[in-house]
Amino acid sequence: MSEKLVEVKDLEISFGEGKKKFVAVKNANFFIKKGETFSLVGESGSGKTTIGRAIIGLNDTSSGQILYDGKVINGRKSKSEANELIRKIQMIFQDPAASLNERATVDYIISEGLYNFNLFKTEEERKEKIKNMMAEVGLLSEHLTRYPHEFSGGQRQRIGIARALVMNPEFVIADEPISALDVSVRAQVLNLLKRMQAEKGLTYLFIAHDLSVVRFISDRIAVIHKGVIVEVAETEELFNNPIHPYTQSLLSAVPIPDPILERQKELVVYHPDQHDYTLDKPSMVEIKPNHFVWANQAEIEKYQKEL
């Protein structure tokens, strides 16, 4: 079994206080192994991006632990510890147009992390790093003097990927990196991410709402609903044997590229009130080897009979 790089234990993230308190994530538990792509899938507002932002330190946590390489990272950190984490953990944002500084050249955008953390000794070394990174993500060296608005959406996302990977990170959080792109460009960006992972030994947390996309790139998938992770399994296991009703409803909504089969398929509608957790409280349980489901004792017995 591969070594755990990231581990989330009993994580809760809330915003506001008192009557205005909103719990965005509750009882989140999962781990990410070195070198794998772990996907977090859910609808808009489910809390998936909130978890990603908490891991990188952009969101505060209310309780629970986030461990990176065995060390707790969501508590107080010294400046040197924080800087080391920023270098090791990078993020690719959803909207490339909004996440890039429109007033800065591509050269400066990609170099900013190198400047901030003194990751080069000479100007020639910096230029060489940037030139190599541009080539790796499929951009030309003459693009360095241009500004973000001069590029297409796919090219802007490649700039965002270059900005993250030039730091030579170990772990990359990809927050819906293709949702703002044209369909024709999405496969190119996904293939680029997979190639960079293979070449550099990267570990990914891939955040998305499209199950057909995560099937292509993921080793394991966690399904999240209203701040609660309801199911975690290896990719093909989850697609072939979904157990939680919410996962079943998500999978039933994935389009089938066959008009006859698409018309014949039955949509599964998820009703949260079908769960009775008043007395019999749920927890994350391993129903099958490496297949975890959020359920109480009555549901566990029901799911096991259906296997």
Swiss-Prot record:
One of its GO terms (molecular function) is ATP hydrolysis activity. ATP binds at residues 42-49. One of its GO terms (cellular component) is plasma membrane. It is found in: Cell membrane. Keywords: ATP-binding, Cell membrane, Membrane, Nucleotide-binding, Peptide transport, Protein transport, Translocase, Transport. Its EC number is 7.4.2.6. Coiled coil: none annotated. Disulfide bonds: none annotated. PROSITE patterns: ABC_TRANSPORTER_1 (PS00211), ABC_TRANSPORTER_2 (PS50893). It is a peripheral membrane protein. It catalyses: a [peptide](out) + ATP + H2O = a [peptide](in) + ADP + phosphate + H(+). The keyword Secreted does not apply. It comes from the Bacteria. Its main location: membrane. The complex is composed of two ATP-binding proteins (OppD and OppF), two transmembrane proteins (OppB and OppC) and a solute-binding protein (OppA). Part of the ABC transporter complex OppABCDF involved in the uptake of oligopeptides. Probably responsible for energy coupling to the transport system. This is Oligopeptide transport ATP-binding protein OppF. It comes from Streptococcus pyogenes serotype M1.
